[in-house]
Amino acid sequence: FFSSRRRHTRYISVTGVQTCALPIWAGVLPADADQFNSLSEKLITRFRTIFPNGGFVHFSSDADFVEDRQTVRFLEDLAQQAGLEPQFVAIDQIGLNADGRFVDHENWIIQAMFKLYPWEQMLRDDYAAPLPTADVRVLEPAWKSILSNKAILPLLWERHKGHPNLLEAYFEGDPGQATLGNSYVRKPLFSREGANVELIDRGVSAEAVVDGGYGQGRFIRQALHDTPRFDDAHVIVGSWVVGDEPAGMSLREDAGRITRDTSRFVPHFIRD
């Protein structure tokens, strides 16, 4: 999406895992280079699937946070291309009418809405109680709150212990955490961009993000597994899924071992 962090000029070949210091616009990429990115096309298709008859859809975020607002603008544009009528409403301008329906700043009833706002925060707000009866379709759906809660990690490990795609994880205070030894990562159940994450390496706090506002709740402990490092950057690969199909790949790099809100989105290219 339109992240304010996209300001880096290193390019990584996914197959060769090699760096090229020259910028992409200099025309140095080979003619057969490709990028794994079908995000726009798949989102347009998905909007049409969810709303086959078109219609009015609200989009909401914090209006003053530039990165979130630009992301929502991008989605509004795709919704319009899909034949919908997007309408933005700031998250703090959503109200409740006498019939228990959510309304926007112009008193239009919100029937369907994409919100760039955490479900866990939404469920703590004053308007959480009317949600089940407000007759509003919310994108992303409420079950996505389970995936953004790190409590799922110990539960997955408990059900699928030893799975190669999982790291050993326990709720803090669980006797099982002793098997992690003296190297692990301490994470809040709710946290974003590395906030309040601490990395313990051989019994020593090797790196920590002390701010972020997530330090008061419960924590998990997860086995320490360092991300790959190229030159002076630690790199992680992320992906977007639209519906049930992969739609794009992202590379984020950070100078530290914890990926933070200052990490960089790095363009990529793929060669056969």
Regions found by a protein language model. Name each.
Residues F1-C20:
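Single conserved hydrophobic/aromatic residue that forms the stacking wall/gate
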Residues A21-D272:
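Domain-scale recognition of functional cores that engage charged ligands
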